[in-house]
Amino acid sequence: AEKKGINMSRIMRSFYAHADSAFSFGVIEAALDDYKRDLGSFDARIQMRSAFPMQMTSLRSGLAGWQYYDIALELVDRAGVRTRILHLDYVYSSTCPCSLELSEHARATRGQLATPHSQRSVARLSVVVTGDLWVEDMVDLARKAVVTETQVMVKREDEQAFAELNAANPIFVEDAARLFCEALRADPRIGDFRVVASHQESLHS
């Protein structure tokens, strides 16, 4: 109660001491230790964001490119207990199952070509890490749960493959959320978790 404020430069010095280290929970823990020692804090929380690159091969042509995932590593130190939290934004395409059925109905009954509407979709997956889990593992879990991830390198044959993949896996937002939850719940390296899925509307105003 007797403290009146904080010197922001002291906070930054705690972080800059680890500027040359690789981005990891271990480095964040070391920075948090310095922060608590330098400022005499009992509880603390730190979150660091980054764009994490992973090489991705196209669906059919075999081209390779870099997919950048928005991630955040969060460390919470409260009452002597530390919690590691990993956040991942997974971007995918979602074809509306209802729209797909209507398109097929138009083709079958009237010979009319129709296009089902698809949305650019994002799932924010936040997990409490209790085992040996890293970003690549989270991406692999997300890809297996919902396979229609947006692509990096695309030729005509890749675009066709992506269209086929979307048609074979139409999905509502609530179903996507359930699939992500099932994948996270089944992994022993994950404690608590939260899934926020958003299918960005392409039909309604």
Task: Map each language-model feature to its residues.
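N-terminal intrinsically disordered, cationic/polar leader segments
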Residues: A1-S205
